[in-house]
From Swiss-Prot:
Keyword Hydrolase: yes
Predominant subcellular localization, coarse grouping: Golgi
Keyword annotations of the record: Golgi apparatus, Hydrolase
One matching Pfam family: CPDase
Active-site residue list: H51, H146
UniProt gene name: cpd-7
Stated name of the protein: 2',3'-cyclic-nucleotide 3'-phosphodiesterase
Residue positions binding substrate: T53, S148, Y151
InterPro entries, alphabetized: Cyclic-nucl_3Pdiesterase (IPR012386), Cyclic_Pdiesterase (IPR009097)
UniProt cross-references to PANTHER family, sorted A to Z: 2',3'-CYCLIC-NUCLEOTIDE 3'-PHOSPHODIESTERASE (PTHR28141:SF1)
Length: 212
């Protein structure tokens, strides 16, 4: 994945943090070894932290040798403004979106993702910029906010997706019902990570962090 990325991580003290971490690193690869790409040499246990990607494709030239200063210069919204709420489980025919939990796209999510894109890629001040507004619409249509659960090259059938959803819910992640009568759980706020995602997956570690 070219460049660096901005991720939103659940607060480390939140109950969902260890649940999602265990699902991603052990439970799902064990139950769905083919779909999780566990045989892929690029992947090892605990291969990525639970996160919602805010933006990718960020040039290292932007933050230079002081990534923390750059990250702190961005006027991030408060924790109360950012509410991550899970919807259902989906899959796309893309390695990094092989299986993921969709996140409800509300104004708070638009604001933080748009800000990340504006400052990290588009050279704009905030999500109101023309290029960022265009990107937000494209992002919404293509895949939107989500938390990846499995990377891999193997297509996942609808029946297997239902099995994944069952495992995820049994682990303690509440998903929204399709009719919209029940809202999924999630977290408020979190920690923004700046991660050089042009490295191997095993080396995806933050070089700067910012608590909302």
């Amino acid at each position: 994945m070219p460049g660096s990325s901005l991720w939103l991580i659940p607060p480390p003290s939140h109950p969902l943090y260890p649940i999602l971490s265990f699902l991603i690193s052990q439970h799902l690869p064990s139950d769905f070894p083919s779909e999780a790409g566990a045989a892929d040499a690029r992947l090892i246990p605990e291969f990525f932290a639970p996160h919602m990607t805010l933006s990718s494709g960020i040039s290292p030239d932007l933050y230079g040798d002081d990534p923390q200063r750059w990250l702190d210069s961005i006027p991030w919204p408060s924790a109360d403004e950012v509410q991550v709420r899970f919807e259902g489980i989906s899959s796309q025919d893309t390695y990094y979106r092989r299986c993921y939990a969709r996140v409800k796209l509300d104004e708070g999510i638009k604001k933080i993702a748009g800000l990340a894109r504006a400052r990290g890629v588009n050279g704009e001040d905030d999500a109101k910029g023309a290029k960022t507004q265009e990107w937000l619409e494209w992002w919404r249509k293509e895949f939107g906010p989500h938390v990846s659960l499995m990377y891999g090259d193997v297509p996942i059938s609808d029946d297997r997706l239902k099995e994944v959803a069952k495992v995820v819910e049994e682990a303690g992640v509440k998903l929204a019902e399709p009719e919209g009568n029940v809202e999924g759980n999630g977290w408020n706020g979190g920690v923004v990570w700046l991660v050089p995602t042009d490295r191997d997956i095993r080396d995806w570690k933050p070089i700067a962090k910012r608590v909302l």
